[in-house]
Amino acid sequence: MNPIHLQARLFLASLVLAGHSSEFRQQSCLHYGPSAVVLEGTLIRRAYPGPPNYASVRQGDEPDTALILSIPKPICVAPDSSSDEGDKQLESGVRELQLAIGTDSLWAQLRAVHSPRLRVTGELFHAISGHHRTRVLIWVIQIRAA
């Protein structure tokens, strides 16, 4: 093979590999609501210390159980640049999201799922209170088995 052709092929191959490696490094972020997202993961029921002291279940605090969606790959969540409303804090490496379930029909959907693997549709929002147990939560619109 001609040395010039070999150099050209090696150069093109290095460009292709460089392009793919930057794709893996640059993770596209999901956005906080009002846009809906769909995430799949495993449901975890985790107890946290609740009232009266929010310090230790072993020392008498009531357990406060949160429903957590554990996703297989970390995501980043960014503000929606087209919206003046909502959360402004960038979060990266998010692997767990607390489920925010606001209606009886959604609770019924959750009870109807007989698998720990879920497919959740909802709007992302940032934690704003002590009752929010993960950095990013999902306001649930729909729950299905994954």
Which residues fall in each region the model found?
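Bacterial N-terminal signal peptides that target proteins for export
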Residues: 2-10
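Bacterial N-terminal signal peptides
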Residues: 9-18
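Short boundary/loop segments of OB/S1/cold-shock single-stranded nucleic-acid-binding domains
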Residues: 22-34
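Structural detector for short beta-strands of small beta-barrel domains
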Residues: 34-65, 122
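Mature extracytoplasmic domains of secretory-pathway proteins
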Residues: 62-64, 68-89
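Beta-strand/loop nucleic-acid-binding surfaces
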Residues: 80-109
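Short nucleic-acid-contacting surface segments enriched for D/E, G, S/T with interspersed K/R
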Residues: 105-120
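OB-fold/S1-family single-stranded nucleic acid-binding modules
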Residues: 128-146
